[in-house]
Amino acid sequence: MVDNYEKFEISDTSRVKSKVFLDKIISAHKAATLVPNGALVGFGGFVGAGAPIVVPMAIADMAEKLHAMGKEFKIKALTGASTDPNLDGVLARSDALSLRSPFITDKDARNAINSNKIAYIDTHLSSLAKQVEAGFFGEMDFAIVEVAGITEDGKLIPSTSTGNAQSWLNIAKKVILEVNTNQPLELLNLHDIATLGLAPNAKALNITKVGDRIGTPYMSADPAKVVGVVVVATPDRVNTFTPLDEISMAIGDNVIKFLQNEISAKRLVKNSLLPLQSGVGNIPNAVLASLKTAGYKGLNFYTEVIQDGLLELIKEGIVETASSASLYLSDKGMQEFRQNIDFYAQHVVLRPQELSNNPEVIRRLGVIAMNGMLEADIYGNVNSTNVMGTQMMNGIGGSGDFARNGYISIFLTPSTAKGGAISSIVPFVSHVDHTEHDTMVIVSEYGYADLRGKSPRERAKEMIKIAHPDYREALQDYFDRACSQEKAGHTPHILSEALSWHDKFNKTGTMKKD
């Protein structure tokens, strides 16, 4: 049963200044009826920020009613990254999705994907828009995009993220705009909107500093393609943070130790380092907290998501500029941002994800990439997506964009999961997202393994050191026996045992030896 989405619709049309678009205002219900069964739909938004939710709720409600009448209705949904529970979650619960890409965090969508009810395509965030533009997914029928307002001359004021919104507006045959009057119009001052085009005519990106701008503050849509404008007042999905625990703080401190060592070795500039990227969640927040007390000044971030911790670093002058794809803040963080939006506009740039995650820019700027993971093996291969090799967690997201192209690629993990029943360091990962060729540093609460310039056997010795003490002896035993084989080779493995830890967990609920 879909919640009452009509409560979010409002009659105030003052945010729609253009007469052309004013004449296109319709209800969310009417907008939903325009979307046919089987449509490929591109939704705006990135990590919950700036995602339309009222029209998706209306689509889900329509789907439930059609299903009750014995009629088929499902759409194929492409986004920027994860979205709001009132987009991913409600569509999944209403059995209104046949396909989803490129990234999810909603538990209902995850369950439907892992039970094979929704086909899921796990894609690098920088790549999806280009793949759709090239026709790999077929024609895009609809773009459904949240904006903060529409100017008199028809320009679209972006919301708290753009994700792939501008690409969808360009590509889709038809467009529905959700004008969210809860979003501040001053967001206009933060955005840098540009698209790259396809080879052989793709544009070079002239971004040589984090704060460089190459586009316009507005998005645009061909008025002839816009079939509906829905005016709403909805809150952004807010980030809920749990207090930082000892393990997260230890990981953050170990990252700082690594960075300090790089400064001592003259591989990084003292105080300002190189541009940083960090993922979402408690461990990245712990890294931000550690940066706060480490004495750095003039830091820059070229990243995907701005969280509360990064906002604090900007306010305190530790971070000079942050380029991102979205603002994903708590209630308190959003209040701080809105009250001081003119200040933050001087330090924050919001870009489409084909810019924020662009490999060309990441490599040129020398970004230090910091991302979470599910597990790594003793040789440095990393699994970021599939629990026990089969169950999708969220997706690769932007970790591949940054890990392969960053100056330094760092992966962060607690040494165990499930109360110690799972070791995050295993003989061989059950799924590979980032190969040993792309991983440089792995950090746990027990230290960091610097894998740069090391052979597989040398890497294994470093990885075992940062594993949980409960698992180190077993890892060392596996490695020693693998090395003692007659044909141990370049990367020693015992193939009959390589995935035995995962098999044991599936059968007994623990990886620990009996």
Where are these regions (language model features)?
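Conserved alpha/beta enzyme-core scaffold
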Residues: 2-514
